[in-house]
């Protein structure tokens, strides 16, 4: 059907190529200048549209989908300050290597710098954070311009995946009329027949340009040398940090590597390796954040996958070693902020692990057996510990141990992810544990969790702190508007408890007023505002009962656990003192 005007034709071409290139969902925010694109994506049979009222929430929702699927989701806004609200999620996507397509509508070019209403400088708005940027030309009804447009969209989507996934930005200017009204002479009646390729693309689900990603394997001699180094080392180690979007080491490859080299796997909770059916057979270790306080010998050879580990004790322990540390990164990037790594292998992590495993003939070493024994004794010590006050780590442990199999678990930054790292024991359940550890902000956590939940039929569990919940409570609107249910565990310690772990705690003032920032907020009214169930608990026992009940019930449940941040911190220190007595 011939488009009624050039804007409609242009926007339909963009929507067609987004869908054909692999975008399955678009988060749309209301606005006038983006009308042509909103109408086009809403009418497209192969695009699911999620309507959002707040741009920041929409961007994090799209980010969460990308984290869960490894595929790009698009977010669409009008011009002006709406575009700036996407920036935090763009930064997270860039740092965490998560595919994301940003579409910003814009005013005509001559209005830039003119003082025209709702007109700001949107060119290169996100700077170096995006993998690809293009300021698209104004809509024009010529075959070549439309072929160029389709090519640009496909190239942009192609840049969201590959060895270094991440966000891309297409800035799309439109003149009025923005609605799909008929403009005589704008689109010639014969245009579709005269230029079928430009008007309709390649048809079906075939993108105008197919961008093919290749899997880079290490050179044979490199894999052989690494295999020899791993099998001859008395204390080999595999460290798996937070995984990239769709480009991390897989459980089967990690298990094969550990089996062939005899090395244990220190698995970050966000690595994709701490939880899953492979845990029963592979030497997966999760208690290192706690037991490295003991006298643990340093490794001699380390293979590192993923981003820098969440655990500070692990990072410092590795930095203090004289080990050869090999970072395997698909893009050849550097994500090792202690600067003690000795090698970088620019190759696909799973392919590298398999290549090394195929050339290694090691057996499980006495070192690995000792580490696994220490791991077992650490978790026994945690289980036996009787805190004098609510230990927030018990909440994290309960979330991990009690989450359904399968489930998606989204963990907030600050103390929740640190407690999850230290207290969530490896488990054979199929848990997709996610978090925003790229830029490590507390903004957008609720929206990210719900975005991840929108991409799966699995139950969704969120573990958030009070400040993160406050910061993104408007993200709860997605529960009804986007059809997502979740169980949200809200640890309310009335402020920023992480600052108790820093030296500034000793200086009050300004510690309480400027760092801990107690707020005294009552979060129960969010139940009425967002039509959810809210339960307040004061003990770990009460929380466990409420958590079990929520998981067995339909709808969204928020379970608040009231804690004393300082008391919990002291109990964490007391447990650490006990663990210090463990040894290999």
From Swiss-Prot:
Listed under catalytic activity are: isochorismate + 2-oxoglutarate + H(+) = 5-enolpyruvoyl-6-hydroxy-2-succinyl-cyclohex-3-ene-1-carboxylate + CO2
Q: Which InterPro entries match?
A: DHS-like_NAD/FAD-binding_dom, MenaQ_synth_MenD, THDP-binding, Thiamin_PyroP_enz_TPP-bd_dom, TPP_enzyme_TPP-bd
Q: Which residue windows does the record flag with biased composition (Basic and acidic residues)?
A: 566-577
Pathway(s) the chain acts in: Quinol/quinone metabolism; 1,4-dihydroxy-2-naphthoate biosynthesis; 1,4-dihydroxy-2-naphthoate from chorismate: step 2/7; Quinol/quinone metabolism; menaquinone biosynthesis
Its required cofactor(s), as named, are: Mg(2+); Mn(2+); thiamine diphosphate
Known EC number: 2.2.1.9
Q: Which HAMAP family match?
A: MenD (MF_01659)
State what this protein does: Catalyzes the thiamine diphosphate-dependent decarboxylation of 2-oxoglutarate and the subsequent addition of the resulting succinic semialdehyde-thiamine pyrophosphate anion to isochorismate to yield 2-succinyl-5-enolpyruvyl-6-hydroxy-3-cyclohexene-1-carboxylate (SEPHCHC).
The record's family statement is: Belongs to the TPP enzyme family. MenD subfamily.
Q: Cite the record's note on assembly.
A: Homodimer.
What is the protein name given in its UniProt record? 2-succinyl-5-enolpyruvyl-6-hydroxy-3-cyclohexene-1-carboxylate synthase
**What taxonomic ancestry is recorded?**
Archaea, Methanobacteriati, Methanobacteriota, Stenosarchaea group, Halobacteria
Gene behind this chain? menD
